[in-house]
Every structure is written in structure tokens, then in C-alpha cells.
UniProtKB/Swiss-Prot annotation:
Protein name per its UniProtKB record: Lipoyl synthase
CDD domains in alphabetical order: Radical_SAM
Family that this chain belongs to: Belongs to the radical SAM superfamily. Lipoyl synthase family.
Species this protein is from: Mycolicibacterium smegmatis (strain ATCC 700084 / mc(2)155)
Gene, per the UniProt record: lipA
GO CC, any one term: cytoplasm
Enzyme class label: transferase
Keywords associated with the record: 4Fe-4S, Cytoplasm, Iron, Iron-sulfur, Metal-binding, S-adenosyl-L-methionine, Transferase
Subcellular location: Cytoplasm
One MF annotation (Gene Ontology) recorded for this entry: metal ion binding
Pathway stated in the Swiss-Prot or TrEMBL entry: Protein modification; protein lipoylation via endogenous pathway; protein N(6)-(lipoyl)lysine from octanoyl-[acyl-carrier-protein]: step 2/2
Superkingdom classification of source: Bacteria
Keyword set includes Membrane: no
PROSITE patterns xrefs: RADICAL_SAM
Length: 314
């Protein structure tokens, strides 16, 4: 029996994935470690206070830029997800009991770090009666209570499309409500078997109808075609998505989906122009862009478009 480091048995899909060696990255997949004064101060603070961010723990290549802008991302709900997506490094399994003190700790971390903008994401919690809706909403509420001048972006699962659970989350009023579609319809079930493409679009539409600024992400290099990406961009815009990020898939381990191709930077430039032409209020596309990359600046850009005649929702 083959097991993963977390101790569970490998899925057949993971065994098949592992037969393909980790791909060699092209020369354009690289970053420069530019450590400015804000980054250096924040890193020291995180060390002293024992704070935890997705930025560090996931080894995000954009940490230097985001921390220099006093932006950071936090993961809530535990280390085990009840769903498995073939690109995601978070492990699948039975999550620990709900930690009802987590919203306070995240809010205090945001406060201690002096963040201008915070992104909160989390695992799917299908084991909980409310799917984790209270946890997501309460984290936003607590951050806003302690940090009234800090923007909050909330990246959520689909809560199985449950209207009551979605409404509870929406009512916490994050500056941005994000739900990532990630890939195109043809390969969606293979990549995200516990999600549905149409349901993900419906979540974005519901958030937009509630009056929130909406956001999604597409990952390239998992077997899609450029024409399919263009179609997905049209679907997202038609669904009411305000902000879109587009990125290159980087394989976390041999048991994850192989990289089908490395998308050249020129293609990201073309897709960015295409998305802007569709009317997205904020667009970022590139090999090392991540869904939370420059999130505060993207929100400000989108808010100027969405709320041209009124102040942004806060």
C-alpha cells in the first residue's frame, strides 16, 4: 500500500499522476527576492509573534511584493479539506473539530501585522451542518471589528449552492467575495470532481446580485485550450464576475495533476487584453500571478468602476 506523508492511502488517480515525473520549469518561471523595508519588518513581526500566513506556508512566489504592500492571506477551517481538487496541495481527509476561536486569532494577526488588505481563504467543510458558513462569515466580522480600515477579501467554496449558507457569508460584507472556477467545463469534473462548473458560476452571480464585488481565477496548463479559456472568461463575465486572475499551474507534488503545458508569457498578455475587452473591472494574468496577488490594488481598481457614483461597500 502506498501512502502519502499525511498517512492516508494514495487514491488511484494519485498513483496514475505519480507515473509522470515532475516537469522541468521554463526560464520565465522565476521570481526575484526583493526584500523591501515593509517586507523585512513584517517578516520579523511574524516570527516574533508566531503568526501563520498562507503566504509563507505555501511558499508563495509573490510574498515579497504583497508583504511590501502590507497584504497577506490566511487559511481557515483547518489543514484537511473534505474535497479533493487535482491541483491543490491541501490534503483531503476528515477535518478536526471546528475551532470557534479561529476568527479572533486571525483578526488579531491582521491587527498585529498592520495589514492594509487581508485575504481569507479556507478548506471545504462538508462535515459541518452549515458547511463552515459561520466560520467564514465570523472571520470577516471579527477582522472588521478589530481592523475597521483594513479591506477583507473572502475566497469561499461553493457551500453546495445552499442559499442560506451563501447569504450568511454575503451578509458579512467582505470588500471582495471570491469563488474560483479554476478550469474550463470540458475538464472540470476531472480536475474538481466535488464541484460543478454551473454551480460555481451561480455562486458568483448570487454574490454580485447581493451587491458585492466578485472575483474568480483560472489556472492554465491542465489540459485546456486557449479557445476554452476565452469561453470560460465570457461565462464568468456573463455571471457577474468583476475581477479575474489567470495563472500558470505549478504542480505541488508527483501525486497531483501533471503540467500539460507551460503557457508562454505572451499568451497571458493576450488573455489579459481579451478579458479587459470583455469588460472585467480588474484583470491580472501571468505565469506567477495567484488569485490573491495584488488583491488590494485590484479591489481598488474594480471598486472605482463598480461604485463610480457612490463610495465602495465597507
Amino acid at each position: 500500500m502506498t501512502v502519502v506523508p499525511e498517512g492516508r492511502k494514495l487514491l488511484r488517480l494519485e498513483v496514475r499522476n505519480a507515473q509522470t515525473p515532475i516537469e522541468r520549469k521554463p526560464p520565465w518561471i522565476k521570481t526575484r527576492a526583493k526584500m523591501g523595508p515593509e517586507y523585512t519588518e513584517l517578516k520579523g513581526l511574524v516570527r516574533r509573534e508566531g503568526l501563520h500566513t498562507v503566504c509563507e506556508e505555501a511558499g508563495c512566489p509573490n510574498i515579497f511584493e504583497c508583504w511590501e504592500d502590507r497584504e497577506a492571506t490566511f487559511l481557515i477551517g483547518g489543514e484537511q479539506c473534505t474535497r479533493r481538487c487535482d491541483f491543490c496541495q491541501i490534503d483531503t481527509g476528515k477535518p478536526a473539530d471546528l475551532d470557534r476561536d479561529e476568527p479572533r486569532r486571525v483578526a488579531e494577526s491582521v491587527q498585529a501585522m498592520g495589514l492594509r488588505y487581508s485575504t481569507v481563504t479556507g478548506v471545504a467543510r462538508d462535515d459541518l451542518p452549515d458547511g463552515g458558513a459561520w466560520l467564514y462569515a465570523e472571520t470577516v466580522r471579527y477582522i472588521k471589528r478589530l481592523n475597521p480600515n483594513t479591506g477583507v477579501e473572502l475566497l469561499i467554496p461553493d457551500f453546495n449552492g445552499n442559499p442560506e449558507q451563501l447569504e450568511e457569508v454575503f451578509e458579512s460584507r467582505p470588500e471582495v467575495l471570491a469563488h474560483n472556477v479554476e478550469t474550463v467545463p470540458r475538464i472540470f469534473k476531472r480536475i474538481r470532481p466535488a464541484f460543478r462548473y454551473d454551480r460555481s458560476l451561480a455562486v458568483i452571480t448570487a454574490a454580485r446580485n447581493f451587491g458585492l464585488v466578485t472575483k474568480s481565477n483560472l489556472i492554465l496548463g491542465m489540459g485546456e485550450t486557449i479557445d476554452e479559456v476565452r469561453t470560460a472568461l465570457r461565462d464568468l463575465h456573463d455571471a457577474g464576475c468583476d475581477i479575474i486572475t489567470i495563472t500558470q499551474y505549478l504542480r505541488p507534488s508527483p501525486r497531483h495533476h501533471p503540467v500539460e503545458r507551460w503557457v508562454h508569457p505572451d499568451e497571458f498578455v493576450e488573455l489579459s487584453a481579451y478579458a479587459e475587452g470583455l469588460g472585467f473591472a480588474g484583470v491580472l494574468a501571468g505565469p506567477l500571478v495567484r488569485s490573491s496577488y495584488r488583491a488590494g490594488k485590484l479591489y481598488a481598481q474594480a471598486a472605482r468602476v463598480r461604485f463610480a457614483d457612490q463610495p465602495p461597500v465597507s
